């Protein structure tokens, strides 16, 4: 019984997905994570891999999670998406449902948003 309890405690105290740092709560129907080990620095620009994990399947694509490579402009407070991959399961698991490697246009981030939180996180590195 003690061994079972020890295993349960060890599993509960260890991170479920190494590398992912939770950046937002579930308030908006999804939780956003960033992997600090993937941050690439080029002057005022930062690239990072993010994971957007949805409570329910996305209404547009039916995916439960999206892996995103984003580029942040620390000086201008803006972001663009460089790459996206859509997955049927949570936390990037399951079948790959598609994706995009077409970079989006830059767009500004407003203070207090989840994107602003990510900008501050990656730009502090």
Please tell me what each predicted stretch does.
Residues 4-12:
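Sec-dependent N-terminal signal peptides
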Residues 15-125:
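N-terminal secretory-pathway/extracellular module detecting exported/lumenal segments
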